[in-house]
Amino acid sequence: IFLTAELTLKSDFSLEELKDKFQNTFSNESFIRYQKNVNLVNTSGSNYCDISIHQNSNKKIIVQASLDNLMKGASGNAIECFNLMHNLPYNEGVGSLMPFYL
């Protein structure tokens, strides 16, 4: 899945402020990565969601995201839920799945 969304912000933010907010929000998430540019091939067959932010103006940004809906979606989610049900770290075993592009 490749998403491109244009968003209007309620307040003015610089691109650096937006990147900092993103990294503060998702710094503890194993499978969410900030990328300068998102490329679908980098998430194919993986449990990663890659996100990039580009700025049109102080209040308009473009967010792009890429994920594999089989791994990050159905099968990756099933493994994460199994782990949580059995009191294991949610990312146990998921990080060892090799992406298709390697």
Identify what each model region corresponds to.
Residues 1-64, 71:
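C-terminal substrate-binding/catalytic lobe of Rossmann-fold NAD(P)-dependent oxidoreductases
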Residues 48-50, 54-102:
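NAD(P)-dependent Rossmann-like dehydrogenase/reductase catalytic/cofactor-binding core
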